C-alpha cells in the first residue's frame, strides 16, 4: 500500500489541479466497493472517485469521454450481454495529448468475450508482469489479472464462503420437494432456495439452446 500511495502522489504532483481522479464502473457491486475502498486507502480523495453503475451507463451510450478524462479507470462490471464499448481506440486517438487516463484496471477481464467493453487490448496479465501497454497509445497501461482474488486468498475465501453458505443450506429444501422449484419461481421466495430455482431456470434455458443448435 505504501508503494501505491507513493505512485498516487507522483500522479498528483504532475497535475496542475493536484488531483488524482478515478472512475469506477460497477461501483455498487462487491468488486466495485472494494475498488473504491482501495482507491481511498491509496490516497485518492473520495470526492475524486466517480462511481458509476447501471443508472449511469444506461443514461447514455459508450464510449465515455469521462473515462479518458480520469487518471484511473476501473472496470468491475458483470458482463451478461452485448453493450457498447466503454472506451475504444477511436476515443483514445481523439483525445490525443489531452488524455488524462494513464491506467486501466480491468477487474472483469473479458478479453476473450466477443462483447468485451474494453476492446483496446487482448491479453491477460500476471502478478509477475501485472501491466500491458495499449498498442499504438503511449503512456497507457492495463492491469488485467483474471485471478485477482488469489492476491488475498484468505479474505477471498472467507467472503465467498460467507455468501455461498446460505444457498448451500437451502439445498435440502429443494432436494426434498420436487415441486419446490416451480413454487419458488412463482413466489420468488428468497431465502427458501430461490437461488437454486434461478440456477435451474438458467440451466434449462441454455440446455434448450444447446439442443436447438444440435449439441
Where in this protein do the model-derived segments appear?
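Conserved active-site and cofactor/substrate-binding residues in soluble primary-metabolism enzymes
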Residues: 26, 30, 34, 68, ...
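Rossmann-like adenosine-cofactor binding region
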Residues: 55-138
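Glycine-rich phosphate/diphosphate-binding loop of Rossmann-like nucleotide-binding domains
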Residues: 1-78
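Short, acidic Gly/Pro/Ser/Thr-rich loop/turn segments
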Residues: 30-32, 81, 112, 150
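Residue-level recognition of the N-termini of beta-strands and the immediately preceding loop/turn
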Residues: 18-21, 47, 101-105, 140
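Short, solvent-exposed amphipathic alpha-helical segments in soluble enzyme
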Residues: 38-42, 89-93, 121-122, 158-163
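Adenosine-phosphate binding glycine-rich loop
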Residues: 1-6, 103, 109-215
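Extended interaction regions within the primary functional domain
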Residues: 5, 15-18, 44, 83, ...
Amino acid at each position: 500500500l505504501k508503494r501505491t500511495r507513493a505512485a498516487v502522489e507522483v500522479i498528483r504532483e504532475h497535475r496542475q489541479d493536484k488531483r488524482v481522479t478515478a472512475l469506477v464502473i460497477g461501483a455498487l457491486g462487491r468488486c466495485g466497493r472494494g475498488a473504491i475502498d482501495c482507491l481511498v486507502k491509496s490516497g485518492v480523495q473520495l470526492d475524486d472517485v466517480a462511481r458509476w453503475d447501471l443508472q449511469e451507463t444506461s443514461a447514455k451510450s459508450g464510449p465515455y469521454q469521462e473515462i479518458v478524462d480520469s487518471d484511473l479507470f476501473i472496470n468491475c462490471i458483470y458482463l451478461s450481454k452485448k453493450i457498447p464499448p466503454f472506451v475504444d481506440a477511436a476515443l483514445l486517438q481523439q483525445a490525443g495529448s489531452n488524455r488524462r487516463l494513464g491506467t486501466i484496471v480491468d477487474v472483469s477481464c473479458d478479453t476473450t468475450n466477443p462483447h468485451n467493453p474494453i476492446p483496446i487490448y487482448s491479453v491477460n496479465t500476471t502478478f509477475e508482469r501485472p501491466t500491458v501497454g495499449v498498442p499504438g497509445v503511449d503512456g497507457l497501461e492495463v492491469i488485467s489479472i483474471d485471478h485477482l482474488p488469489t492476491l488475498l486468498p484468505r479474505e477471498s475465501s472467507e467472503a465467498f464462503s460467507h455468501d455461498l453458505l446460505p444457498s448451500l443450506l437451502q439445498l435440502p429444501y429443494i432436494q426434498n420437494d420436487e415441486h419446490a422449484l416451480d413454487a419458488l419461481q412463482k413466489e420468488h421466495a428468497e431465502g427458501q432456495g430461490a437461488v437454486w430455482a434461478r440456477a435451474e431456470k438458467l440451466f434449462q434455458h441454455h440446455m434448450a439452446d444447446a439442443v436447438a443448435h444440435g449439441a
